[in-house]
């Protein structure tokens, strides 16, 4: 299966809906390293901003263009540590997809590695980054 720009756009929009609808449950999971209970809220606000920005992308847009738009939207909308980390992950993913019209499984895995690496470089205690690293390995 290949991932087109339209598929990535729709996935981000759906992810924003899912995170928003489950933000209280995610907040309740937030106990380490700081138990402030706002991870779900911050991630929801962050990805909702990216979702708003990526909605205008046409079905013909490349996966590279959509990923770049998402990365920019996440960065501009980043809230809290989790939002910043999410934006860093996607900045790396965007770099990994740069120049591609579509992405196959190998390209997605490589992009996830870029995302994980990008975020790890910026975070001192990368607890939530383990998921991205594990996904890239799969």
Roles of regions detected by a PLM:
Residues 33-43, 73-90:
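Conserved phosphate/anionic-ligand binding catalytic regions in large, soluble enzymes, centered on
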Residues 131-136:
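Conserved small/polar residues in nucleotide/adenosyl-binding loops
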Residues 75-79, 98, 124:
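Alpha-solenoid HEAT/Armadillo repeat architecture
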Residues 40-41, 120-130:
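A structural signal for small-residue-enriched, beta-sheet-centric alpha/beta enzyme cores
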């Amino acid at each position: 299966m290949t991932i087109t720009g339209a598929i990535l756009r729709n996935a981000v929009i759906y992810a924003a809906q899912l995170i928003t609808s489950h933000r209280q449950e995610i907040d309740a999971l937030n106990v380490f390293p700081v138990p402030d209970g706002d991870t779900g809220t911050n991630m929801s606000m962050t990805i909702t901003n990216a979702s708003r920005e990526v909605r205008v992308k046409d079905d013909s847009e490349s996966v590279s263009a959509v990923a770049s738009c998402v990365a920019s939207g996440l960065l501009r909308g980043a809230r809290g540590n989790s939002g910043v980390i999410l934006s860093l992950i996607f900045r790396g993913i965007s770099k990994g997809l740069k120049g591609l019209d579509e992405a196959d499984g190998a390209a997605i895995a490589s992009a996830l590695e870029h995302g994980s690496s990008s975020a790890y470089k910026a975070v001192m205690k990368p607890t939530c980054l383990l998921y991205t690293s594990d996904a890239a390995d799969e």
